[in-house]
């Protein structure tokens, strides 16, 4: 049926009303908000208001950057690469798959003492834990101790979901590629006798991961029975219930395992391996001197052109060593201050000139 055209209907924004009915309209309500009549304030950016902002930013950012940079430089840190691809490296012999297990020793010297608690990290390069399929290759329900997920893992774990017709625990590519080198640190005394450094392996994982996200399957005191019917990941040397003799650090709640399962965002990363606690305020945690690093070499990285390293580091109120943050603050503050000076010169030069318009920014 044809509809008669009515100019008033177009203005009202709707069809004519039916006899006896109310008029329908799409016109917004006549309010300040819907009609965009709210009061507004728009600042006029003049040299007198903008220039102080540039100088204030510069005067704030530069001292902060200097403080962060100096603090970062005061952090003691040493890296020992033990990949072993160089023929002269003590770990070069471990690249052969026939040498199992392989133990190599790297000697190094600390020029300055390490005060306070010392953190030992392992670092990997050219390892892309941020790959989409790799990140998804896990079953969080299984890791949280769910009994049904233990025997029937998620399909996201493929191709590391089942092996030998048994479900893998823990399943997935992340768990299958867990770092498994063993690192031991020794201080070489005056009599050239190695003194072992106590390495604490508990307290390296996030509290929320240890107590919330990761749990062993329910059951009795025998952890092996709780994982009955499952098999170890393909690349693991032992099952998950044999990761540690300490029952509070075994199975899915093993802290080395928990740390590894928190994937890194970049291909070059470090993960906390051990803690070296300070025993006395009278003596440094790691005195200057000669040390040796004993490595049980299990984790091959040369297949993907990767590298491995051990890092010893102290920390400060801002965390670990990170000179970039201080440099960034100094750079932003310097650029802001320099722009303020340039704009101040331009404004001073042309402010009283009658041949040019007033400069507004």
Swiss-Prot record:
Glycan-carrying positions: 180, 190, 294
Main localization category: membrane
UniProt keyword annotations, A-Z: Acetylation, Cell membrane, Cell projection, Cytoplasmic vesicle, Disulfide bond, Glycoprotein, Golgi apparatus, Lipid transport, Membrane, Transmembrane, Transmembrane helix, Transport
Role, per record: Accessory component of a P4-ATPase flippase complex which catalyzes the hydrolysis of ATP coupled to the transport of aminophospholipids from the outer to the inner leaflet of various membranes and ensures the maintenance of asymmetric distribution of phospholipids. Phospholipid translocation also seems to be implicated in vesicle formation and in uptake of lipid signaling molecules. The beta subunit may assist in binding of the phospholipid substrate. Required for the proper folding, assembly and ER to Golgi exit of the ATP8A2:TMEM30A flippase complex.
Protein name per UniProt: Cell cycle control protein 50A
Record's comment on post-translational modification: N-glycosylated. Contains high mannose-type oligosaccharides.
Gene source species: Pongo abelii (Sumatran orangutan)
Disulfide-linked positions: 91-104, 94-102, 157-171
Transmembrane region(s): 50-70, 326-346
Side Cytoplasmic, residues: 2-49, 347-361
Subcellular location: Membrane; Golgi apparatus; Cytoplasmic vesicle, Secretory vesicle membrane; Apical cell membrane
Segments for region (Required for ATPase and aminophospholipid flippase activity): 2-48
Modified residues (N-acetylalanine): 2
A family per Pfam: CDC50
Region annotation (Interaction with ATP8A2) ranges: 49-348
């Amino acid at each position: 049926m044809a509809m008669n055209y009515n100019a008033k209907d177009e203005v009202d924004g709707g069809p004519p009303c039916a006899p006896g009915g109310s008029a329908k309209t799409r016109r917004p309500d006549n309010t300040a908000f819907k009609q965009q009549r709210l009061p507004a304030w728009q600042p006029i950016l003049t040299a007198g208001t903008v220039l102080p902002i540039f100088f204030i930013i510069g005067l704030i950012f530069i001292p902060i950057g200097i403080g962060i940079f100096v603090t970062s430089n005061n952090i003691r840190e040493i890296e020992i690469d033990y990949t072993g691809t160089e023929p002269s490296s003590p770990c070069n012999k471990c690249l052969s798959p026939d040498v199992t297990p392989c133990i190599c020793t790297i000697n190094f010297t600390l020029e300055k003492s390490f005060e306070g608690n010392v953190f030992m990290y392992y670092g990997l390069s050219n390892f892309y834990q941020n790959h989409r399929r790799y990140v998804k290759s896990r079953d969080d329900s299984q890791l949280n101790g769910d009994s049904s997920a233990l025997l029937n893992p998620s399909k996201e774990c493929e191709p590391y979901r089942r092996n030998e017709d048994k479900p893998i625990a823990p399943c997935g590519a992340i768990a299958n590629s867990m770092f498994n080198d063993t690192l031991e640190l020794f201080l070489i005394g005056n009599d050239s006798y190695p003194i072992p450094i106590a390495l604490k392996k508990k307290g390296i994982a996030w509290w929320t991961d240890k107590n919330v996200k990761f749990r062993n399957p329910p059951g009795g005191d025998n952890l092996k029975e709780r994982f009955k019917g499952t098999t170890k990941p393909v690349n693991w040397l032992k099952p998950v219930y044999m990761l540690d003799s300490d029952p509070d650090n075994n199975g899915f709640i093993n802290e080395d395992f928990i740390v590894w399962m928190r994937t890194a965002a970049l291909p070059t990363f470090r993960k906390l391996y051990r803690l070296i606690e300070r025993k006395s305020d009278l003596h440094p945690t790691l005195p200057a001197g000669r040390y040796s690093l004993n490595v049980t070499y299990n984790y091959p990285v040369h297949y993907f052109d990767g590298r491995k390293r051990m890092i010893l580091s102290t920390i400060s109120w801002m965390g670990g060593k990170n000179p970039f943050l201080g440099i960034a603050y100094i750079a932003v503050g310097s650029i802001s201050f320099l722009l303020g000076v340039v704009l101040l010169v331009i404004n001073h030069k042309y402010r009283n000139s009658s041949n040019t318009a007033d400069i507004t920014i």
